[in-house]
Amino acid sequence: MFARQVIRPARQLQQHVRRYASEAPQSGGSSNGALYVGIGAAGLAGAYIYMRGGKPAAPLSEEANKVAAKVGGASKKAFTGGDQGFISLLLDKSEVVNHNTKKLTFKLPEPDMESGLPVTSAVITKYKGPEMEKPVIRPYTPVSDVDQQGTVDFIVKKYEKGPMSSHMHNMEPGQRLDIKGPIPKYPWSPNKHEHIALIAGGTGITPMWQTARAIFKNPEDKTKVTLVFGNISEEDILLKKEWEHLENTYPQRFRAFYVLDNPPESWQGGKGFITKELLKTVLPEPKEGEKVKIFVCGPPGMYKAISGGKKSPSDQGELDGYLKELGYSKDQVYKF
C-alpha cells in the first residue's frame, strides 16, 4: 500500500510514493508513518503568522459565470464583483473548530442564492470598530461548495494582534459583516492538469480545500491531488476528517502528508519543517511539464523556504526556494 510499507531506500521510496495504490488506507491511522521515518524531516523553529493580501474585486469571467445552472435557469449569485461593492451578510452560526479557530456561516441575501464565488477565489471583509480611525480589511477564502445555497462558510483562525480575526471570533449570530467579492485567483477548470500538489501551512489550507473539494465533487474531473500540510500541533490540522474522507474514498487519486512542529508521542507523520526531501519524495516530478501544477499557501516563512514570496497580491514574483531547487519552473507553481 502507498507509503505504508517498511522503510526502504530513498530511490525505491520515491518511485513507490509517486504511484497511487489500488486499495484504500485504513481509517483512523496515519498512512504515511514509514515515509516520514525514512526521510527524517528536520525540526521547525516556532509558529508561523499567516497574512495574505488580495486585489480589488473584478467582474466575473465567462468561465466563472458557469456555476451550476439549475432547472429553470441559472442560479442567483450573491457576489457579482465589478461595481457591486460590499454587501452586509448576517452571521447564522459560529462553531468552535479548535482552540483558536472557528467556522462561521453567513446567510446570503436570499435562501436560493449561491455565493457566485469561483473555485480558488476569495473575498474581502471589512470592519470598523467604534474607536478605529479606518476600517480593517482582510481577505478570506470560503470553504463551502460553490453551489451551496443560502449560506457561505469560512474557517477563521484568531490571531492575538489580528483585529479582523478577533472581531469575527467575537461575533454573535444575528450580527452582520461587510463582505465583497470575488477576488479571482487561479482560473481552475476540470482536468486542467493531470496531477496537482497542494502545499499549505495553517489557515493556508482554505483555498486548497476549495480546490480539492471541487475536483472530487465533479465526476468528470480525474485530477490527482497530493496534499502536504504543515502545522504546529495535531489539533491545528484543519479539516482533517474531511481530508481523511477524501483519502479513503479516492485512494488512487488523493494522498495527504502532515508535518507537525509539536507532535504527540504517538505521531507517525512528519516532524518539523516541510522539507526539500519530503517534497522531492511525494510531489509529481517537474519533468511532467504542464501536466503538473504546484499550489502554495501559508505564512511568509513557508513561502520563503518553499517557493519564494509573491511580489505583490497581483504579481507572483520569481520562483525560489525548494521548488526551484527541485527543478520546477515558475509556470508550474502558483502562490495563493
Swiss-Prot record:
It is a single-pass membrane protein. It holds the Pfam family FAD_binding_6. Residues 84-189 form the FAD-binding FR-type domain. GO terms for cellular component: mitochondrial outer membrane. The keyword NAD applies. The chain crosses the membrane at residues 28-50. Disulfide bonds: none annotated. It catalyses: 2 Fe(III)-[cytochrome b5] + NADH = 2 Fe(II)-[cytochrome b5] + NAD(+) + H(+). PROSITE patterns: FAD_FR. It is found in: Mitochondrion outer membrane. GO terms for biological process: ergosterol biosynthetic process. Its main location: mitochondrion. Coiled coil: none annotated. CDD domains: cyt_b5_reduct_like. The keyword Phosphoprotein does not apply. Keywords: FAD, Flavoprotein, Membrane, Mitochondrion, Mitochondrion outer membrane, NAD, Oxidoreductase, Transmembrane, Transmembrane helix. GO terms for molecular function: cytochrome-b5 reductase activity, acting on NAD(P)H. Its EC number is 1.6.2.2. InterPro entries: CBR-like, Cbr1-like_FAD-bd_dom, FAD-bd_FR_type, Flavoprot_Pyr_Nucl_cyt_Rdtase, FNR_nucleotide-bd, OxRdtase_FAD/NAD-bd, Riboflavin_synthase-like_b-brl. FAD binds at residues 192-227. It comes from the Eukaryota. Its cofactor is FAD. May mediate the reduction of outer membrane cytochrome b5. Belongs to the flavoprotein pyridine nucleotide cytochrome reductase family. PANTHER family: NADH-CYTOCHROME B5 REDUCTASE, NADH-CYTOCHROME B5 REDUCTASE 2. This is NADH-cytochrome b5 reductase 2.
